[in-house]
């Protein structure tokens, strides 16, 4: 039985969306138990009674505008912190939150702890592509500044996840750069390119450009945290803007536009489903001693359900235990 700690108070739509997502997951997966951390009375308004769910009451929560590290240290009874503490104490196997990203990263690093040998855990998300084959990308903002050694480790981490969790036998790893030639990029990218070229444990295919990653150029895309976060937000903004523009064109385009949309209804629905990033789950702070996963702040119940499904897969495959062995065979997860 997998025990998953869930911060019920984090995110724009908490606790309703969080609890409703938990209800869906419990109904489908019989091998999970959920610990909900937060305001018990508010949680019970949406919770369907189940013997595999428990509530740990707390009135304290971390707000979106709280300074991450200070919040973790001062708000010891916050729902997010208690969830991370449960993982540290082995009362839970993983923790999920849609709350303050920086605070969750801090809780992951300072409470759960990183795997020995991993210099900087990376924030990684599985992204949709136009081909229908998702790709993993990291770092998405856990670290604003990185060295070439960090990017080297991100490539190993991302490849490991793609292989063991997503089932890709030989993941193609690409380095995000401003050109595909090996001579492109600044000193960071050039040094990282050399390190990745010499890494025998990964299938490094060279540099990839931002315009190529949505077209299936690589299974794993490696970037420094600043660049990765900027690209992620550009992708999200472009997707939302495209759908909004398309909807406006249909609604304001008269009878012909509406008729065309009706005829293309199934195609448009399929396109929307292909580009729905929520179905891939949340962003993993990979390189820690247990799964710490961030849902989007605006997550609905569907996104929460898929994140729990993702965490269940991580626990089923024992990817963290395997990662510990890969980086330091002598260390035990604790």
From Swiss-Prot:
Q: Where in the cell is it found?
A: Cytoplasm
> What GO CC terms are in its UniProt record?
cytoplasm
| Catalyzed reaction equations | a fatty acyl-[ACP] + phosphate = an acyl phosphate + holo-[ACP]
* Record EC number: 2.3.1.274
Keywords assigned: Cytoplasm, Lipid biosynthesis, Lipid metabolism, Phospholipid biosynthesis, Phospholipid metabolism, Transferase
What are its GO biological-process terms?
A: fatty acid biosynthetic process; phospholipid biosynthetic process
Q: Does the keyword Cytoplasm apply?
A: yes
Offer an example of a GO molecular function term for this protein.
phosphate:acyl-[acyl carrier protein] acyltransferase activity
Question: Which SUPFAM superfamilies does this UniProt record tie to the protein?
Answer: Isocitrate/Isopropylmalate dehydrogenase-like
**Involved pathway(s):** Lipid metabolism; phospholipid metabolism
Question: What does the record give as the function of this protein?
Answer: Catalyzes the reversible formation of acyl-phosphate (acyl-PO(4)) from acyl-[acyl-carrier-protein] (acyl-ACP). This enzyme utilizes acyl-ACP as fatty acyl donor, but not acyl-CoA.
Q: Which NCBIfam families match?
A: plsX
Quaternary structure?
A: Homodimer. Probably interacts with PlsY.
As for family, the record states:
Belongs to the PlsX family.
Classification via PANTHER family: FATTY ACID/PHOSPHOLIPID SYNTHESIS PROTEIN PLSX (PTHR30100), PHOSPHATE ACYLTRANSFERASE (PTHR30100:SF1)
What name does this protein carry?
Answer: Phosphate acyltransferase
- In its UniProt entry, the species of origin is given as Streptococcus thermophilus (strain ATCC BAA-250 / LMG 18311)
Q: What is the gene name? A: plsX
